[in-house]
From Swiss-Prot, chains A, B:
One of its GO terms (molecular function) is ITP diphosphatase activity. Coiled coil: none annotated. Keywords: Hydrolase, Magnesium, Metal-binding, Nucleotide metabolism, Nucleotide-binding. This is dITP/XTP pyrophosphatase. Pfam families: Ham1p_like. Mg(2+) binds at residues 39, 68. It comes from Hyperthermus butylicus (strain DSM 5456 / JCM 9403 / PLM1-5). Substrate binds at residues 10-15, 69, 143-146, 166, 171-172.
Length: 190, 190
């Protein structure tokens, strides 16, 4: 059976690959859409993703997914949180590790929000993974902060894992499995 | 002559005081409006302020000002930039100084954008001030990163200056003077 296609408003190949690894189990796959993504500035990832998905749906007039994720470091008051991508592009992993020099509490969590906008409204699926920030980057897979995030239950960083293994632990894998559940229950979005 | 009132979508008393110190020279003052501020996530302050001002105008049906500002640190790739307020609330001045430990290049600039939305559209006024990040916080006036910003032409931080002196140098003072110029030329916004 051929997988049904849902559009996703991203050009991040890693995100697409990770989500597709999960969605194949329910007979779907995502493909990038050329929609500009209007992001609202909010401390809630849910708001950012839902709003962007609605905007993309209005532009495309087809069901569309937006995924937004953030890394929340406990000792830094949740920083970089909803602005993880901007922070990654400016101070990067090096800056993050500098902020955590001599900081004992390395606890952090990743959160992913998948928003699916369709003719019936917008559905929001979330996934969270707790873990710690490594002392040094390890691994070359994945993207973003993956080289310094070690999820609970593993001694590897996300960047040391294949997609399938990362998805077992990851925030994005969990959110994508929630999306699968919804698709199984309600069928193809329109 | 009594000053004409323009609404401003902020609850930050420092911003209001600084803008009013300039606006009195052209016969206006701003007063806080109870409009929720929808911020778009953009790397351009102009977009954030203009969009928020339009939203506030639509909600209030009266001319309204939004001021948005950011601190751009050269050695940090422009960080914290448009997310200065969020970064201040999480890692704070302490985090910023930690990122700059052993960094020789302390150059930074503050930028302020004042957007005025009215029945004729939206006007955007900007002001920039170049300077350096101090080694340690000094002074207790102002707000945000003021204790660590030393503008070119002074040896004081913004937090060591009275409002009037800060306005002579500051990004916000410059943007407010641009607004004054516009108000003198076009009269009260409707």
């Amino acid at each position: 059976m051929e997988a049904r296609v849902i559009l996703i408003a991203t050009t991040n190949k890693h995100k697409i690959e990770e989500i597709n690894e999960v969605l194949q189990s329910c007979g779907y796959r995502v493909e990038p859409a050329a929609a500009s993504k209007l992001e609202v500035q909010s401390n809630r990832l849910e708001d950012v993703a839902a709003y962007a998905a609605i905007q993309a749906y209005l532009a495309l007039q087809r069901p569309v997914i937006v995924e937004d994720a953030g890394l929340f470091v406990e000792a830094l008051g949740g920083f970089p949180g909803p602005y993880s991508s901007y922070v990654f592009k400016t101070i990067g992993i090096r800056g993050l590790l500098k902020l955590l020099e001599d900081v004992e509490n390395r606890r952090a969590y990743f959160k992913s929000v998948i928003a699916l906008a369709h003719s019936g409204g917008v559905e929001v699926f979330t996934g969270t993974v707790h873990g710690v920030i490594a002392e040094k980057p390890r691994g070359d897979r994945g993207f973003g902060y993956d080289p310094v995030f070690i999820p609970e239950g593993s001694s590897k960083t996300f960047a040391e894992m294949e997609t399938q293994e990362k998805n077992k632990f990851s925030h994005r894998g969990k959110a994508a499995r929630e999306l699968c559940r919804w698709l199984r229950q309600y069928g193809p979005p329109r």
